[in-house]
Regions:
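Basic/aromatic-rich interaction segments and small domains that mediate binding to polyanionic partners
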Residues: 4-12, 16-79
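Intrinsically disordered, low-complexity linker and terminal regions at domain boundaries
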Residues: 81-85
Length: 85
């Protein structure tokens, strides 16, 4: 188990899954879908946020959201962490 050290680059960015985790058959909708999603930041904080699903696979969802500082960001998260709004 890793522990925050205070030296993590971009500690408030969401952790994102890698392609081996989310799979290869990616579906991309014409219009992003409004969702609520749980993210875990690089420093280990957990937040439930409003986001848009911009792509998905059987296992995961690629979300686009505004971080708590008002900056746009994206992350791949597990499908179980996402519900439609």
């Amino acid at each position: 188990v890793s522990r925050p050290t205070g030296n993590t680059p971009f500690p408030k960015r969401a952790r994102t899954l890698n392609p081996k985790q989310y799979g290869h058959e990616v579906t991309t909708p014409e219009t992003p879908m409004p969702v609520r999603a749980w993210i875990v930041t690089m420093s280990g904080d957990e937040f439930e946020i409003d986001a848009e699903a911009i792509a998905w696979t059987r296992r995961a969802v690629h979300i686009s959201y505004m971080d708590r500082f008002g900056h746009p960001d994206t992350a791949w998260v597990w499908a179980g962490a996402v519900v439609r709004r």
